[in-house]
């Protein structure tokens, strides 16, 4: 209806436009509509000529192709629609409604998300000429339906006059600004009648009652409250019979179009709640119910119920026993008791109460013989008068309820273990059930334990009729193995539970049930026994250690599995697993890692890097150790230790129940097998002097993995029988080192190594000369770096030999091969000569190198007299010991100073010829030759006195120390003489003083007189 009124006003506005030029207008957009709901778009044309009834054509431009027109429907051409809309037009889902001759409405009954787009209304021209607009566009946006309305479906039974409250949840999640309206409806029984509106909250947040509920809304009998953002509650204070039927809630979502008109876009209804209303009845009946077995000592509760009364009657109840009133409760809840029962109520033996508006209760907590008889209740409906007193309107009484006490009968006792298990594992809970048969009565129970190999029972626990629990001496205090708990399941069933059992808990358990009787002097008792066994956890504990690869390649990964086998695998007991390691060089096991039963991981500190490359996984009865990047440090013996705890150990600090250690397992970490292969073919290179050459070292295959190579180049001169000399070495870290014989600047510049590719290395030799002739080869080493930073050599291969020859230059050096030998005395000088048989041209220079060799030792370069006259010593210490010079054009001399015994051996020289070559000119070694080996024998010299003295260490020490000893003795003698002379002088002086003292004493008087006279003379002067 809102859409039709909008369209009417829309077209009324458009008719007011002046007629002159054609103008087509459509509803202003954008228009937001929900998926699955209808939409109507109006189109009007004015200022047209021709017939009053104009034709309209509707098209859409979809967002996927905004420039492509998709034809929907036309009032002129039935075949106007494109294929995507043909079926919807035929089914009536899309149609055009003509409002007037120049106005239409495009209807889409059920929107789809693909219907979103820009809609165009076009009017074919009926004018004499084109003047004005012939089409107009508007945007339609299809949004998801997010409206939700829910209410639980239920059936309610109410009495007339009672209140009713129903809650409806309505929510939306639309991105656009929308309003929500909520309406409650009632459908009368039969389903064919139209729903009656009860009350609604409009989109403008205004409460609007339905036509039939206006008066009740004004009287606040019908209300609609919004409890939260999405919660709406319908409240009816006093139900009427006309309210019976099905109630439901309808939520409607509204949106405001650009022309400020509100349009609904979604609408949802909830499930229905069926309401049945019972008419109010003024009359009532009274019944009495008894809840008891009528046994002595048992409680008795009598309930007086009022049936079919009004909604809220004012009732008072009166209790009678054997026709005598014992208690009453008025309508205000005031209690009145007779004297005897007032005393029993004060002692807690009796309770009279009002359970509800229509229920009264009389409760006796412990029945006795005095309580046998007939009970009756009387209920009166009353109303309060103006004076405040209660006026009885009607009175009803219940039938009598007779109470007769039952006599105690013989009982049967059944004892069993919980879950029917008489064999449990250590640490498990042991639970016993003791059930007494017969009539309900207060019972007490006591539990006894007879350990194995004993006959005397031990008291475990007991519970009296009052529920007080007593524990035995050995069970009263929590011990190592747990606690004892006694529980009363019902009046006849008792449970004894011993948690964290130990092996000592095995044996026979006895349950004694007792019942007291007022008419008997002794209590009645019944007994039952059962035997149980507690098995040790350690008895079935087995630990095994295994590995899929006890022999591991270096840097590979290996795993160790510690498997626990026990007969109690289903108990899920906590385990502590300790991994231990004994290195190959030790006899002591060290802790690697400890996974405790409470989840804590403790790492040992024996292997520093072990934690960073180890993964530990642990399940209930299995622990796995995964070690990555194995090194030689991990070589050794492994074992695992398992400790079993009880299930409550997470909350206490009890020691383990059992433990076991696996067998030791040896893990060997070995180097991987080398797959290195080097080209072993030999070759010969013949070169011109002073040219450059390359010697290749080709690798045919290598081992897999992150391995590094070391390349070492060796050289063996042609003219000597010396061992291979190291030229250059490029180690596995790409550091280049020069051999001992190639440290000179000239040789460092001559030889260079290069890594051409991963599998090809070259030795570059610059300016080849005669001294470079010989054989060359390379040695390739494979190195593996372990995680601890240690390099390991996997293998070594040597290449084939490359022989380097020089093309003839016409020059040839010949050194005299005359055999020479000489004996020389120690500490003398000796000269060794090397002679040329012929001398070359004046442009030729010569250099000589002197070598020395001794049996069981390698050759040694002593000195090198270069072609330019410079001397280069093999060792710096030889500079003072020997001298090399050229005595003539054909003679070279090596002179040894102060020959020692160690200088004996073979000496020889190597003479090289040098000439200038190339531009710019450079001295090149063209040819060389060696002399015959010359033998030098050193004889020991004749010993002299100084030499003998120096050669004897004791004599040398004696000659050095003796003067000091004699000097010391002389000083001591002089000191003694001085001391004796001084002592003698002192004695003589003392003798003179004694004599002088006697003379002085004799002449004392005269001396005194003379002194006084002298003093007087001095004063007179």
Curated annotation (Swiss-Prot):
Signal peptide: 1-20
Membrane topology (Extracellular): 21-954
Membrane topology: Single-pass type I membrane protein
Cytoplasmic side: 976-1021
Domain of life the protein comes from: Eukaryota
PROSITE patterns per record: IG_LIKE
Sugar attachment sites: 44, 322
Cystine bridges: 43-121, 168-249, 304-377, 434-511, 562-640, 697-778, 834-909
Record SUPFAM superfamilies: Immunoglobulin
Subcellular location: Membrane
Function noted in UniProt: Plays a role as inhibitor of T-cells proliferation induced by CD3. Inhibits expression of IL2RA on activated T-cells and secretion of IL2. Inhibits tyrosine kinases that are required for IL2 production and cellular proliferation. Inhibits phospholipase C-gamma-1/PLCG1 phosphorylation and subsequent CD3-induced changes in intracellular free calcium. Prevents nuclear translocation of nuclear factor of activated T-cell to the nucleus. Plays a role in the inhibition of T-cell proliferation via IL10 secretion by cutaneous dendritic cells. May be a marker of CD4(+) CD56(+) leukemic tumor cells.
MF terms in GO: hydrolase activity, acting on carbon-nitrogen (but not peptide) bonds, in cyclic amides
Transmembrane segments: 955-975
Native source species: Homo sapiens (Human)
Main location class: membrane
InterPro entries: Dihydroorotase_CS (IPR002195), Ig-like_dom (IPR007110), Ig-like_dom_sf (IPR036179), Ig-like_fold (IPR013783), Ig_sub (IPR003599), Ig_V-set (IPR013106), IgSF_V-set/TM_domain (IPR051102)
Domain Ig-like C2-type: from-to ranges: 22-139, 144-265, 279-389, 408-525, 541-651, 656-794, 808-925
Protein name according to UniProt: Immunoglobulin superfamily member 2
Gene designation: CD101
Ranges spanned by the short sequence motif EWI motif, renumbered to the chain: 253-255
Tissue: Expressed in lung, thymus and small intestine. Detected in cutaneous dendritic cells, activated T-cells, monocytes and granulocytes as well as with epithelial cells with dendritic morphology. Expressed in some leukemic cells, the CD4(+) CD56(+) blastic tumor cells, as well as in Langerhans cells from LCH (Langerhans cell histiocytosis) patients.
GO biological process terms on file: cell surface receptor signaling pathway; positive regulation of myeloid leukocyte differentiation
Keywords: Disulfide bond, Glycoprotein, Immunoglobulin domain, Membrane, Repeat, Signal, Transmembrane, Transmembrane helix
């Amino acid at each position: 209806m809102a859409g039709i009124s909008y369209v009417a006003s829309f077209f009324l506005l458009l008719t007011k436009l002046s007629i002159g030029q054609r103008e087509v207008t459509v509803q202003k957009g954008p228009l937001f509509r929900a998926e699955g709901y209808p939409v109507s778009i109006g189109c009007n044309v004015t200022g047209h000529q021709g017939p009053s009834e104009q034709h309209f054509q509707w098209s859409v431009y979809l967002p996927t192709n905004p420039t492509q027109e998709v034809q929907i429907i036309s009032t002129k051409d039935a075949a106007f629609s494109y294929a995507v809309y043909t079926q919807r037009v035929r089914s009536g889902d899309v149609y055009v409604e003509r409002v007037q001759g120049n106005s239409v409405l495009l209807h889409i009954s059920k929107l789809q998300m693909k219907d979103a787009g820009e809609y165009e209304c076009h009017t074919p021209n009926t004018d004499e000429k084109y003047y004005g607009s012939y089409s107009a566009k508007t945007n339609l946006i299809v949004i998801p339906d997010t409206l939700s309305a829910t209410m639980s479906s239920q059936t309610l039974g109410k009495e007339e006059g009672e209140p009713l409250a129903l809650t409806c949840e309505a929510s939306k999640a639309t991105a656009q600004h929308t309003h929500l309206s909520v309406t409650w409806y009632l459908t009368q029984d039969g389903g064919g009648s139209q729903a009656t509106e009860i009350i609604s909250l409009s989109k403008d947040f205004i409460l609007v009652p339905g036509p039939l509920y206006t008066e009740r809304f004004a009287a606040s009998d019908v209300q609609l409250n919004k409890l939260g953002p999405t919660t709406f509650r319908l409240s009816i204070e006093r139900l009427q019979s006309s309210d019976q039927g099905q109630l439901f809630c309808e939520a409607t979502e509204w949106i405001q179009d650009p022309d400020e008109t509100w349009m609904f876009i979604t609408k949802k209804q909830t499930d229905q709640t069926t309401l049945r209303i019972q008419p109010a009845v003024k009359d009532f009946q009274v019944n009495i119910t008894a809840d008891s077995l009528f046994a002595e000592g048992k409680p008795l509760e009598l309930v007086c119920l009022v049936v079919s009364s009004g909604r809220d009657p004012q009732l008072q109840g009166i209790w009678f026993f054997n026709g005598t009133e014992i208690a009453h409760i008025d309508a205000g809840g005031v209690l009145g008791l007779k004297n005897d029962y007032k005393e029993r109520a004060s002692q807690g033996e009796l309770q009279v109460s009002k359970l509800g508006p229509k229920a009264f209760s009389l409760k006796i907590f412990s029945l006795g013989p005095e309580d046998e008889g007939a009970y009756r209740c009387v209920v009166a409906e009353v109303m309060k008068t103006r004076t405040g007193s209660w006026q009885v309107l009607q009175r009803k009484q219940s039938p009598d309820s007779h109470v007769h006490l039952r006599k105690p009968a013989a009982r049967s006792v059944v004892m069993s273990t919980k879950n029917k298990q008489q064999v449990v594992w250590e640490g498990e809970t042991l639970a016993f059930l003791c059930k007494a048969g017969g009539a309900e009565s207060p019972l007490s129970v006591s539990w006894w334990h007879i350990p194995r190999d004993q006959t005397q029972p031990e008291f475990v626990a007991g519970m009296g009729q009052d529920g007080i629990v007593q524990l035995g001496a050995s069970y009263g205090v929590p011990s190592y193995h747990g606690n004892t708990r006694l529980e009363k399941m019902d009046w006849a069933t008792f449970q004894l539970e011993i948690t964290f059992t130990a092996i000592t808990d095995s044996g026979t358990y006895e349950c004694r049930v007792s019942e007291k009787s007022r008419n008997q002097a002794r209590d009645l008792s019944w007994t039952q026994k059962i035997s149980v066994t507690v098995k040790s956890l350690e008895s079935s504990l087995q630990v095994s250690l295994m590995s899929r690869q006890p022999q591991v390649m270096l840097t590979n990964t290996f795993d160790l599995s510690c498997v626990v086998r026990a007969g109690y695998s289903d108990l899920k007991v906590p385990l502590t697993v300790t991994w231990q390691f004994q290195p190959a060089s030790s006899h002591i096991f060290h802790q690697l890692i400890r996974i405790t039963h409470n989840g804590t991981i403790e790492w040992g500190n024996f292997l520093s890097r072990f934690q960073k490359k180890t993964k530990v996984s642990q399940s209930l009865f299995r622990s796995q150790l995964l070690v990555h990047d194995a090194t030689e440090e991990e070589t050794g013996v492994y074992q695992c230790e398992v400790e079993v705890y009880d299930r409550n150990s997470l909350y206490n600090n009890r020691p383990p129940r059992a433990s076991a250690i696996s067998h030791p397992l040896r893990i060997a970490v070995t180097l991987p097998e080398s797959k290195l292969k080097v080209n072993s073919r030999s070759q010969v290179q013949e070169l011109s002097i002073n040219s450059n050459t390359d010697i290749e070292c080709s690798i045919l295959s290598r081992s897999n993995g992150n391995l590094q190579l070391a390349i070492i180049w060796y050289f063996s001169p042609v003219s000597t029988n010396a061992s291979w000399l190291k030229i250059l070495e490029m180690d596995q870290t790409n550091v280049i080192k020069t051999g001992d014989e190639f440290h000179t600047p000239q040789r460092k510049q001559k030889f260079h190594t290069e890594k051409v590719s991963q599998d090809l290395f070259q030795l570059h030799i610059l300016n080849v000369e005669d001294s470079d002739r010989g054989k060359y080869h390379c040695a390739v080493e494979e190195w593996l770096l372990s995680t601890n930073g240690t390099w390991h050599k996997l293998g070594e291969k040597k290449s084939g030999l490359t022989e380097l020859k020089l093309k003839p230059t016409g020059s040839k050096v010949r050194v005299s091969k005359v055999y020479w030998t000489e004996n020389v005395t120690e500490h003398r000088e000796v000269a060794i000569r090397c002679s040329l048989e012929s001398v070359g041209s004046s442009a030729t220079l010569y250099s000589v190198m002197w070598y020395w060799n001794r049996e069981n030792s390698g050759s040694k370069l002593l000195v090198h007299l270069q072609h330019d006259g410079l001397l280069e010593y093999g060792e710096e210490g030889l500079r003072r010991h020997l001298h090399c010079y050229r005595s003539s054009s054909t003679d070279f001399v090596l002179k040894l100073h102060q020959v020692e015994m160690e200088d004996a051996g073979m000496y020889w020289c190597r003479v090289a010829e040098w000439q200038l070559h190339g531009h710019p000119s450079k001295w090149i070694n063209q040819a060389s030759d060696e002399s015959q080996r010359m033998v030098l024998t050193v004889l020991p010299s004749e010993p002299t006195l100084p030499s003998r003295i120096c050669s004897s260490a004791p004599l040398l020490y004696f000659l050095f120390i003796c003067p000091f000893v004699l000097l010391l003795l002389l000083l001591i003698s002089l000191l003694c003489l001085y001391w004796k002379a001084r002592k003698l002088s002192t004695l003589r002086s003392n003798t003179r003083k004694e004599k002088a003292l006697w003379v002085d004493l004799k002449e004392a008087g005269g001396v005194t007189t003379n002194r006084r006279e002298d003093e007087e003379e001095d004063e007179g002067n």
